[in-house]
């Protein structure tokens, strides 16, 4: 994944890959509003900060922002774009949020990120990491595409998964790579992976018009389940 997102950061069209900075505040406010929340203060972990298009606005809301990304080149851009003194930029591995400590986040934000992860195992590992870094009373705000029910969407997912590595071997562009195109969970798989991560849904919404083929655009507010015993 690091190679793919370093390549995106090196492009003169980086906004094409990570989103338009001019709409970042509106998207952020809309995400919180559609989930009936307006979090402020405390520590926010921004998962997949990219070149920092939302980071500065998060710094206005929260006392501290840990903006994490898998790409060193994206973090270089983010540091040059965001001057807020309450932001720490953190390089993380592709499958987790190390070196962040347990229970450190009052809020976890993951927006336009899970859609790019190339397999269910990586999505599930990120959900577990959200639970790990969340404080006991913390909330995670997550956006992701969820496959619509039916045989045709399932068939499309299988065919797409088989074709993407072949296409990436012929075409070298960022958008052809599995690490950009991502994987689509079914609703049942998402429920299973949330349960395994000990995360519960406290608010949910969907876009009226999804930008994803054969998938709903889903927005979730998540909280940690209490530890047993």
PLM regions and their residue ranges:
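Class I SAM-dependent methyltransferase SAM/SAH-binding core
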Residues: 51-96
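A short glycine-rich, Lys/Arg-flanked "PGG" loop and its adjoining helix->strand segment in the class I
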Residues: 124-136
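A short SAM/SAH-binding and catalytic strip from SAM-dependent methyltransferases
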Residues: 107-121
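A short acidic, Gly/Pro-enriched loop at the edge of an enzyme's catalytic core
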Residues: 98-108
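C-terminal alpha-helical "lid/dimerization" subdomain adjacent to the S-adenosyl-L-methionine
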Residues: 147-193, 204-205
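Conserved class I S-adenosyl-L-methionine
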Residues: 1-39, 41-50
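Conserved beta-strand signature within the Rossmann-like core of class I S-adenosyl-L-methionine
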Residues: 137-144
């Amino acid at each position: 994944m690091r190679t793919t997102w370093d390549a995106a950061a090196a492009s003169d069209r980086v906004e094409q890959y990570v989103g338009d900075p001019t709409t970042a505040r509106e998207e952020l406010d809309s995400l919180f509003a559609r989930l009936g929340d307006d979090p402020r203060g405390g520590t926010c972990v921004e998962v997949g900060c990219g070149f920092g298009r939302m980071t500065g606005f998060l710094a206005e809301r929260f006392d501290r922002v840990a903006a994490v990304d898998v790409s060193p080149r994206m973090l270089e851009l983010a540091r040059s774009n965001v001057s807020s003194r309450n932001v720490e930029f953190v390089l993380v591995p592709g499958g987790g949020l190390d070196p962040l400590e347990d229970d450190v986040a009052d809020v976890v934000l993951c927006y336009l990120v899970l859609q790019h992860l190339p397999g269910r195992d990586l999505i599930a590992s990120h959900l577990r990491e959200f639970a790990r870094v969340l404080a006991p009373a913390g909330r995670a705000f997550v956006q992701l595409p969820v496959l619509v029910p039916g045989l045709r969407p399932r068939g499309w997912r299988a065919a797409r998964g088989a074709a993407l590595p072949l296409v990436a071997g012929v075409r070298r562009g960022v958008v052809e790579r599995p690490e950009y195109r991502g994987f689509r969970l079914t609703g049942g798989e998402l429920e299973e992976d949330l349960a395994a991560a000990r995360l519960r849904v406290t608010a949910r919404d969907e876009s009226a018009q999804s930008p994803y083929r054969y998938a709903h655009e889903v927005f979730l507010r998540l909280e940690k389940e209490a530890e047993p015993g």
